[in-house]
Every structure is written in C-alpha cells, then in structure tokens.
C-alpha cells in the first residue's frame, strides 16, 4: 500500500525543513516501505506493508 507517514500523534510526518532524500530513508527505515519522497509538506511512502499504519483522512485528528 501507499500513504503518508505519521508522527507519534497520528499526524502527517513533516518533511520540512528536511534535506533532500530524507523521506525515502525515513519510509524505508521506519515503515519498511520500498520508497518515499517529500510530497510537501509531508513524507509519502510507497510499498508499505499492510500491517503498518499510514495516515488516514477518516481517522485524522490533526
């Protein structure tokens, strides 16, 4: 699956002001995703395993 990485409060994980390539590494390391990029202003991840939670509009509290 794919989606936005979340912080500890369930909000989208910000990529501002992170260096280029930060989100790719973050998604791979923390979400076990295949890749990721900064979809300003938040990290968006591809190839996230189905058991890993990503940000969901329906349950957004931020």
Curated annotation (Swiss-Prot):
One of its GO terms (molecular function) is sodium channel inhibitor activity. InterPro entries: LCN-type_CS_alpha_beta_dom, Scorpion_toxin-like, Scorpion_toxin-like_sf, Scorpion_toxinL, Scorpion_toxinL/defensin. It is found in: Secreted. The modification Cysteine amide is found at residue 62. Has the structural arrangement of an alpha-helix connected to antiparallel beta-sheets by disulfide bonds (CS-alpha/beta). Belongs to the long (4 C-C) scorpion toxin superfamily. Sodium channel inhibitor family. Beta subfamily. This is Toxin Tb2. It comes from Tityus bahiensis (Brazilian scorpion).
């Amino acid at each position: 699956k794919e989606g936005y990485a979340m912080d500890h409060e369930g909000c989208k994980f910000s990529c501002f002001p992170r260096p280029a390539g930060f989100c790719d590494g973050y998604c791979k390391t923390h979400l076990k995703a295949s890749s990721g990029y900064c979809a300003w202003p938040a990290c968006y991840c591809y190839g996230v395993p189905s058991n890993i939670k990503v940000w969901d509009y329906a349950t957004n509290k931020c």
